[in-house]
Amino acid sequence: MRHKLAGRKFNRTSAHRQAMFKNMAVSLIEHELIKTTLPKAKDLRRVIEPMITHAKNNDTVAARRLAFARLRDRAAVQKLFAELAPRYQERAGGYVRILKCDFRAGDQAPMAYVELVDRPVAE
Protein backbone atom coordinates (compact mmCIF):
# COMPACT_ATOMS: atom_id res chain seq x y z
CA MET A 1 0.00 0.00 0.00
CA ARG A 2 1.04 3.55 -0.65
CA HIS A 3 0.07 5.20 2.61
CA LYS A 4 1.96 8.40 3.47
CA LEU A 5 4.85 7.95 1.04
CA ALA A 6 6.37 11.34 0.30
CA GLY A 7 7.53 12.47 -3.11
CA ARG A 8 6.48 11.69 -6.65
CA LYS A 9 7.87 9.19 -9.14
CA PHE A 10 7.52 11.27 -12.34
CA ASN A 11 7.54 8.01 -14.35
CA ARG A 12 11.32 7.73 -13.89
CA THR A 13 13.68 5.34 -12.19
CA SER A 14 15.12 6.44 -8.87
CA ALA A 15 18.54 7.14 -10.44
CA HIS A 16 16.96 9.21 -13.21
CA ARG A 17 14.86 11.14 -10.70
CA GLN A 18 17.89 11.79 -8.49
CA ALA A 19 19.93 13.01 -11.48
CA MET A 20 17.05 15.22 -12.65
CA PHE A 21 16.75 16.97 -9.28
CA LYS A 22 20.54 17.31 -9.01
CA ASN A 23 20.62 19.03 -12.40
CA MET A 24 17.67 21.23 -11.49
CA ALA A 25 19.28 22.20 -8.17
CA VAL A 26 22.53 23.16 -9.93
CA SER A 27 20.57 25.24 -12.45
CA LEU A 28 18.61 26.97 -9.69
CA ILE A 29 21.79 27.80 -7.76
CA GLU A 30 23.49 29.07 -10.91
CA HIS A 31 20.64 31.12 -12.42
CA GLU A 32 18.48 31.70 -9.30
CA LEU A 33 15.36 31.40 -11.47
CA ILE A 34 14.21 28.41 -13.52
CA LYS A 35 10.97 27.39 -15.23
CA THR A 36 9.66 23.85 -14.83
CA THR A 37 6.43 21.96 -14.27
CA LEU A 38 4.57 22.65 -11.04
CA PRO A 39 4.98 19.16 -9.48
CA LYS A 40 8.72 19.18 -10.22
CA ALA A 41 8.98 22.65 -8.71
CA LYS A 42 7.28 21.48 -5.52
CA ASP A 43 9.61 18.50 -5.19
CA LEU A 44 12.69 20.59 -6.04
CA ARG A 45 11.97 22.74 -3.00
CA ARG A 46 12.42 19.64 -0.81
CA VAL A 47 15.87 19.12 -2.34
CA ILE A 48 17.30 22.66 -2.34
CA GLU A 49 16.10 24.09 0.98
CA PRO A 50 17.94 21.58 3.22
CA MET A 51 21.10 22.22 1.17
CA ILE A 52 20.92 25.95 1.79
CA THR A 53 20.20 25.41 5.49
CA HIS A 54 23.16 23.04 5.80
CA ALA A 55 25.45 25.52 4.02
CA LYS A 56 24.17 28.35 6.19
CA ASN A 57 24.64 26.57 9.51
CA ASN A 58 28.11 25.12 9.02
CA ASP A 59 30.76 26.26 6.56
CA THR A 60 33.24 23.44 7.03
CA VAL A 61 35.18 21.28 4.63
CA ALA A 62 32.89 18.37 5.50
CA ALA A 63 29.80 20.44 4.69
CA ARG A 64 31.30 21.48 1.35
CA ARG A 65 32.14 17.87 0.55
CA LEU A 66 28.60 16.79 1.36
CA ALA A 67 27.21 19.52 -0.90
CA PHE A 68 29.62 18.49 -3.66
CA ALA A 69 28.56 14.85 -3.27
CA ARG A 70 24.97 15.91 -3.88
CA LEU A 71 25.55 18.52 -6.61
CA ARG A 72 28.74 17.36 -8.38
CA ASP A 73 29.44 20.92 -9.54
CA ARG A 74 32.27 22.99 -8.05
CA ALA A 75 30.90 26.35 -9.16
CA ALA A 76 27.49 25.61 -7.64
CA VAL A 77 29.04 24.56 -4.32
CA GLN A 78 31.20 27.69 -4.29
CA LYS A 79 28.19 29.93 -4.95
CA LEU A 80 26.11 28.05 -2.37
CA PHE A 81 28.61 28.71 0.40
CA ALA A 82 30.02 32.09 -0.71
CA GLU A 83 26.85 33.91 -1.84
CA LEU A 84 23.67 32.11 -0.83
CA ALA A 85 24.55 31.09 2.73
CA PRO A 86 25.46 34.67 3.81
CA ARG A 87 22.39 36.04 2.00
CA TYR A 88 20.02 33.82 3.99
CA GLN A 89 21.84 34.00 7.33
CA GLU A 90 18.95 35.85 9.00
CA ARG A 91 16.16 33.90 7.26
CA ALA A 92 14.81 30.81 9.00
CA GLY A 93 13.81 28.73 5.98
CA GLY A 94 11.64 29.55 3.00
CA TYR A 95 14.49 30.27 0.59
CA VAL A 96 12.56 29.20 -2.52
CA ARG A 97 9.51 30.85 -4.07
CA ILE A 98 7.26 29.01 -6.52
CA LEU A 99 5.22 31.19 -8.87
CA LYS A 100 2.61 29.53 -11.06
CA CYS A 101 2.75 30.84 -14.62
CA ASP A 102 1.10 29.35 -17.69
CA PHE A 103 0.43 25.95 -19.22
CA ARG A 104 2.88 24.25 -21.58
CA ALA A 105 1.79 24.42 -25.21
CA GLY A 106 2.35 20.75 -26.06
CA ASP A 107 0.52 18.96 -23.26
CA GLN A 108 -1.07 21.71 -21.12
CA ALA A 109 1.09 20.79 -18.13
CA PRO A 110 0.98 23.49 -15.43
CA MET A 111 4.27 25.38 -15.40
CA ALA A 112 5.90 27.36 -12.62
CA TYR A 113 8.89 29.57 -11.97
CA VAL A 114 11.14 28.53 -9.11
CA GLU A 115 13.23 31.37 -7.75
CA LEU A 116 15.42 32.06 -4.78
CA VAL A 117 13.92 34.79 -2.62
CA ASP A 118 15.87 38.03 -2.11
CA ARG A 119 17.74 37.48 -5.35
CA PRO A 120 19.28 40.54 -6.98
CA VAL A 121 17.13 41.72 -9.87
CA ALA A 122 18.88 42.92 -13.02
CA GLU A 123 17.89 46.41 -14.07
Curated annotation (Swiss-Prot):
Keywords: Ribonucleoprotein, Ribosomal protein
UniProt key word Ribosomal protein: yes
Annotated GO MF terms: structural constituent of ribosome
Keyword field contains NADP: no
Swiss-Prot/TrEMBL GO biological process terms: translation
A GO-annotated cellular component: cytosolic large ribosomal subunit
Signal peptide: none
Quaternary structure, from the entry: Part of the 50S ribosomal subunit. Contacts protein L32.
Protein family membership: Belongs to the bacterial ribosomal protein bL17 family.
HAMAP family: Ribosomal_bL17
Name of this chain's protein: Large ribosomal subunit protein bL17
Natural source organism: Dichelobacter nodosus (strain VCS1703A)
